[in-house]
């Protein structure tokens, strides 16, 4: 469980912090990227909470 939480934290944390280089052809995907960034922040936060809770049981 802790290992899975670490993987989720790293992957979705990097995704949440990443910047997308959007060209004119990709502007229709901006809403999807914004939504994914918000989801990624929540997933990373939950994973961090699981890790924190697991370390201090």
Curated annotation (Swiss-Prot):
Q: Which domain of life is it from?
A: Bacteria
Compartment(s) where it occurs, according to its Swiss-Prot or TrEMBL record: Cell membrane
Query: What kind of membrane protein is this, topologically?
Result: Multi-pass membrane protein
For the keyword Cell membrane, the answer is: yes
Q: Which residues form the signal peptide?
A: none
* Stretches that traverse the bilayer: 2-22, 32-52
Q: What is its main location?
A: membrane
Q: Name one GO cellular component term.
A: plasma membrane
List the keywords (alphabetical). Cell membrane, Membrane, Transmembrane, Transmembrane helix
- Name this protein carries in UniProt: SPbeta prophage-derived uncharacterized membrane protein YotH
Q: Which organism is it from?
A: Bacillus subtilis (strain 168)
Q: Lineage in the entry?
A: Bacteria, Bacillati, Bacillota, Bacilli, Bacillales
